[in-house]
A protein has these predicted regions:
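Glycine-/small-residue-rich active-site loops that bind phosphorylated ligands and cofactors
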Residues: 103-104, 130, 181, 284, ...
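Active-site PLP attachment segment
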Residues: 168-204, 227
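Phosphate-binding glycine-rich loop
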Residues: 27, 31-73, 79, 87-90, ...
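N-terminal "arm"/small-domain region of PLP-dependent enzymes with the aminotransferase-like
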Residues: 1-28, 337
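Conserved active-site segment immediately N-terminal to the catalytic lysine
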Residues: 151-185, 212-217
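PLP-dependent aminotransferase-like
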Residues: 66-153, 160
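PLP-dependent aminotransferase class I/II
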Residues: 33-41, 45-51, 110, 114, ...
């Protein structure tokens, strides 16, 4: 069996060294020393000013909305994981969808201003597959209309735009450290901001809104993460370069094998680095996608229709709206297996099946 993804695990002894320390200290959670160390190490690795390690990427988005005091409409993308939209609704705000760019698959920055109303308070955009949005144009729009900007950077660990971490754009960026991600802490998330006052507010929100032994400053949540999760994050961090290099090598193997596939790749931001978080292909038709997926399934090779269906037309708690580009792309995009342990021989096998179905 070849899964669509498989978590990277460090050598067991490296993880257990951290676990021995947890056992000795008996400090399991509540901003323990490993969680604090992970925050410091990640700030250095990612070259960001301020960062918090939290429960997961979804809670990170919810905390970001809360910290920025957003209560109205939030312009967002219908082509993302459901947590992007559900977090908006969970916080009592209204998502306003804007169609995506057919090349980058990120929110189309040229269409954002048409969606702005007197109720608009923020833009929440996703760096799809780690491919950065048009962060410069979005920043210009936000300044012009006095809007907050949150980036769902769940896929964008390690990516840089114009030599700067993609996490440093917007008021807040959030990242997922779920085990399916290229860098993970089993479960986990990050909140990144350049604003020290906002960081202080987010830290309080993460800890139930507590500001001292006997006082509260915010409406808070339990957004903390445990020492066990921090241990996995620390153990994995030293392997990130090897993980990146291997995923790049495997992606290039796909490129070589699939040069005659009736499909196109995502057009990457011209000023951004790649982290090879996913290998998506946009096939020429949904019919071809379904045939390929069915044959791969029969051979126990599992792919993912990521993201399908469109969030704007599929969520039971929102009015259904169809956006032509999102509807089209979501029906034709397929993510192929990509993970550290995948071999080039397995990729050759996957690609032979794909091309056989296409050419028959």
């Amino acid at each position: 069996m070849i899964p669509v993804t498989k978590p990277f695990l460090p050598p067991k002894e490296e993880y257990l060294k951290y676990i021995d320390g947890i056992w000795n200290r008996q400090w399991l959670t509540n901003m323990g020393p490993l969680a604090s160390q992970l925050e410091m190490d990640l700030k250095e690795f990612l070259d960001v000013q301020h960062l918090l390690f939290v429960t997961n990427g979804t809670v990170a988005i919810q905390m970001a909305i809360k910290a920025l005091d957003i209560t109205g409409e939030i312009i967002t993308t219908p082509f993302s994981f459901v947590a992007t939209t559900s977090s908006i609704v969970w916080e009592g705000c209204t998502p306003v969808f804007v169609d995506i760019c057919p090349d980058s698959l990120c929110i189309d920055a040229d269409k954002i201003e048409d969606a702005i109303t007197e109720k608009t308070q923020a833009i929440l955009a996703t760096h799809v597959y780690g491919n950065p949005c048009d962060v410069i144009k979005i920043e210009q729009i936000a300044k012009k209309h006095n809007l907050k900007v949150i980036y769902d950077a769940a896929h964008a660990f390690g990516v840089k735009v114009n030599g700067k971490s993609v996490f440093e754009y917007g008021d807040i960026s959030t990242c997922s450290l779920h085990s399916t991600k290229l860098y993970h802490s089993v479960e986990g998330g990050l909140i990144i901001t350049q604003n020290p006052d906002l960081l202080k507010k987010l830290a309080s929100i993460r800890n139930f809104g507590i500001s001292g032994f006997d006082s509260f400053s915010e409406l808070g949540i339990n957004g903390k993460n445990s020492e066990f999760h921090a241990a996995m994050g620390l153990a994995n961090l030293k392997h990130t370069e090897a993980i990146h290099n291997q995923r790049k090598k495997l992606s290039e193997c796909y490129d070589k094998n699939l040069k005659n596939l009736k499909a196109r790749k995502v057009v990457w931001h011209k000023d951004a680095t790649q982290n090879y978080a996913y290998y998506p292909v946009v096939l020429e038709s949904e019919e071809l996608l379904l045939k390929i997926k069915a044959e791969l399934d029969l051979n126990e090779i599992f792919t993912r229709r990521y993201f399908y269906p469109s969030l704007a037309s599929s969520l039971p708690y929102l009015p259904k709206v169809e956006f032509p580009i999102t509807e089209d792309i979501s029906k034709r995009v397929l993510c192929l297996p990509l993970y550290f342990d995948l071999t080039e021989e397995e990729i050759d096998y996957i690609c032979r099946i794909i091309l056989k179905i296409q050419n028959n």
